[in-house]
Amino acid sequence: MTEKPISLSDYQQKVDDWIKEYGVRYFSELTNTAILMEEVGELARLMARKYGDQSFKKGENEASQLADEMADVLWVLTCLANQTGVNLEEAVKANFEKKTTRDASRHKNNPKL
């Protein structure tokens, strides 16, 4: 049986429930911002090794790391959204509309693309 995809709102709630049950409380917003930067750095390191010019170090294994690092970034970003009262589902919809309006022909008319 396959699980039903999870909405951003449901994900935000699941993260909040997990924090309250297992994490005791959220770290401060500043601490979570620093943790987010750390997680983005880990993702960047993996991207540089997998798609860039760096090679993996002896003993490093890239299998499934990319998805895990992206999920770590999403987790901490969701914690910050929960802490600051941002509804990610609404924010993503509004951001998509903004980009569509602003960039309706911008990329199509870009000779570099």
Walk through the language-model features, giving the residues of each.
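Flexible "arm" and connector segments at domain edges
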Residues: 1-70, 74-113
